[in-house]
Amino acid sequence: MLRRRGSPGMGVHVGAALGALWFCLTGALEVQVPEDPVVALVGTDATLCCSFSPEPGFSLAQLNLIWQLTDTKQLVHSFAEGQDQGSAYANRTALFPDLLAQGNASLRLQRVRVADEGSFTCFVSIRDFGSAAVSLQVAAPYSKPSMTLEPNKDLRPGDTVTITCSSYQGYPEAEVFWQDGQGVPLTGNVTTSQMANEQGLFDVHSILRVVLGANGTYSCLVRNPVLQQDAHSSVTITPQRSPTGAVEVQVPEDPVVALVGTDATLRCSFSPEPGFSLAQLNLIWQLTDTKQLVHSFTEGRDQGSAYANRTALFPDLLAQGNASLRLQRVRVADEGSFTCFVSIRDFGSAAVSLQVAAPYSKPSMTLEPNKDLRPGDTVTITCSSYRGYPEAEVFWQDGQGVPLTGNVTTSQMANEQGLFDVHSVLRVVLGANGTYSCLVRNPVLQQDAHGSVTITGQPMTFPPEALWVTVGLSVCLIALLVALAFVCWRKIKQSCEEENAGAEDQDGEGEGSKTALQPLKHSDSKEDDGQEIA
């Protein structure tokens, strides 16, 4: 346990010692803080909650409590051996002394500033040691935006106006959104700047440039991302002279189709009145959705291109009512709707669509596996076509023209220019012969790119190794059969010989018995003869 000796400045040394204990002790004492950041408004007071569970018989004389900045280890407030050591943080911090004995080690931070934002660590030491960090998120609401126009008088349809939206004294940096009267977001021709003052609070200035229509409402929304608080403001601009429809602007009904890398002409025309002078003409081309300026002609002078210097008018034809725009080196990103604004005494506008396209390359066909193919093998056929736009339609068919839709997987990926590379994979089981065709179609150009492959499966044949193995096995089998036949023949022959030998033995025994019987007959006959003689 740390003990305080000497001057009150010992609190700093206690903080250093506890900082060392951070690395040495196990933190058996459980210290609890909120998981979510504490959000505090600038100028208000904030409470950084911290608590621990005191053991029975706990005394404040045993408590050492340190609050410090987590990153810099700067001391904020300390309590040691039963005494509050006070604040080292501009005298703006305080503990809750009446609640310390209950385990409440929370810190009250007064008159919060932007610079206070960050992480604070609560160190608690009794017999054991514990610590935890809590985050402070500072915020300040933004003021209601003010809207200004430049120019702000004598406005006519077709004029270009700069609208500035300003909001002050907020924190952190704001998110700014513009939209028109129909709620459509406006992202083109917007410039936003944010600058912090001495207190760290931000002033926001967002500028939108638009071409006026008959009537227009423009809204600015400034959002505080921490407070999720929105500050709104809007302005409605009504030009002094409403359009009478005298200026009829004509554009094609169908989209203009242009190939990537070529030039496209977006046609727009109007009917000039007698005595018309180019000094009276205000002509604006802009993107319909985002209102981004593309090209302008004002008071008899071409103001040039604000579209990467790729646009031009037809100056020799303007006096005849030709307000067409030439767009050079078309890109995929150019696709969309362009609005042609014409203002003389009256006003008119119309929108024309640009459809970008790029033909697909002739498909290349690859096989996997690509050799030693036999009927019945499964083969993967890949059809690849490159640098087309928009996304392609892919069709497969066999040699008889039958569509193949099963086991087909197609992927399309755009490169940095927005052009698509197409890879379509077909898995098939080979027959004796097979032709497979891949068709890649551009839906805008209605252009088809074909590729095909004919696969002839090799007939079933035995390799030389298999033939020699078969011959060897056949010879071995024949030899085995011959050997078996020979053994059987020997067995049969031996059996026959044994039977013949047995038969001869029986015949010899029969003859011997007959010979033995014959002398008996002779003796009997002699006896008979002797009897007779007697």
UniProtKB/Swiss-Prot annotation:
Q: Which family does it belong to?
A: Belongs to the immunoglobulin superfamily. BTN/MOG family.
Q: Which organism is it from?
A: Homo sapiens (Human)
Any one GO CC term of this protein is: external side of plasma membrane
Give the range the annotation lists for the signal sequence. 1-28
Question: Could you tell me the gene encoding this protein?
Answer: CD276
Recite the lineage of the species: Eukaryota, Metazoa, Chordata, Craniata, Vertebrata
Keyword list, A-Z:
Disulfide bond, Glycoprotein, Immunoglobulin domain, Membrane, Phosphoprotein, Repeat, Signal, Transmembrane, Transmembrane helix
GO molecular function terms attached to this record? signaling receptor binding
Q: Which InterPro entries match?
A: BTN3A2-like_Ig-C (IPR053896), CD276_IgV (IPR047318), Ig-like_dom (IPR007110), Ig-like_dom_sf (IPR036179), Ig-like_fold (IPR013783), Ig_C1-set (IPR003597), Ig_sub (IPR003599), Ig_sub2 (IPR003598)
Cellular compartments annotated: Membrane
The topology of this chain with respect to the membrane is: Single-pass type I membrane protein
Ig-like V-type domain span: 29-139, 243-357
Induction description = By bacterial lipopolysaccharides (LPS) in monocytes and by ionomycin in T and B-lymphocytes. Up-regulated in cells mediating rejection of human transplants.
Under which name does UniProt file this protein? CD276 antigen
Q: List the disulfide bonds.
A: 50-122, 165-220, 268-340, 383-438
Comp. bias intervals (Acidic residues): 498-510
The tissues in which it is expressed are: Ubiquitous but not detectable in peripheral blood lymphocytes or granulocytes. Weakly expressed in resting monocytes. Expressed in dendritic cells derived from monocytes. Expressed in epithelial cells of sinonasal tissue. Expressed in extravillous trophoblast cells and Hofbauer cells of the first trimester placenta and term placenta.
Which is a Pfam family this sequence falls into?
Answer: C2-set_3
